[in-house]
């Protein structure tokens, strides 16, 4: 009876081991390479946006909203942008500013709306009626893009280490295989004797 329980336990351990093995194999062959490739692409795009931000950076303020409202002050631009109603499309380009497209996104939560600063990569923030929108946009262009770059570099480093570790740990051999084979053989032998 105890031998039967030991064999059942070892079979369960082997099934768990094989499930983990196949998950790790999938991670190594598909998931990790795709993530690493995406992180590298994001880093490359964000680095391009940093160059755009440097190129267009100026202390003079000017923004053209909806191709018809010119504004030379942040306060006036805030007022114009705040009064734009989200369109029935998901996204609506409302302005170009310092080399980036400013997009109003229809997805909203309660009294908040989403704004996207689009370059080679998208930088999102939510705002409500009281938000200083131009301050948020300036802050993202000046600091947020660099923070996003740091975040993806950390993710890439972490994922690369995890990928390397996973490759060294991948082993299809169940560590208790010999024990399982011996106990199964012994159990079969006992069952044959009991049947006779």
Locations of the language-model features?
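Extended, charge-rich alpha-helical segments
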Residues: 48-103, 185-194
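C-terminal accessory region of SF2 helicases/translocases
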Residues: 1-70
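Mid-to-C-terminal oligomerization/interaction "stalk" domains of large proteins
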Residues: 1-27, 87-196
């Amino acid at each position: 009876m105890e031998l039967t329980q030991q064999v059942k336990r070892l079979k369960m351990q082997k099934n768990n081991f094989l499930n983990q093995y196949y998950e790790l194999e999938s991670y190594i062959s598909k998931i990790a390479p795709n993530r690493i490739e995406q992180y590298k692409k994001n880093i490359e795009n964000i680095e391009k946006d940093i160059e755009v931000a440097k190129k267009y950076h100026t202390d003079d303020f000017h923004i053209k909203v909806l191709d018809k409202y010119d504004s030379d002050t942040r306060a006036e631009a805030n007022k114009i942008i705040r009064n734009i109603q989200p369109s029935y499309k998901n996204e609506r380009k409302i302005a170009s500013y310092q080399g980036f497209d400013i997009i109003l996104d229809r997805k909203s939560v309660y009294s908040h709306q989403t704004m996207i600063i689009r370059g080679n990569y998208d930088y999102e923030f939510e705002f409500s009626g009281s938000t200083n929108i131009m301050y948020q946009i300036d802050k993202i262009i000046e600091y947020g893009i660099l923070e996003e770059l740091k975040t993806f570099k950390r993710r890439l480093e972490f994922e690369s280490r995890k990928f390397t570790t996973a490759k060294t740990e991948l082993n299809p051999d169940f560590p208790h295989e010999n024990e399982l084979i011996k106990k199964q053989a012994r159990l079969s032998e006992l069952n044959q004797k009991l049947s006779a």
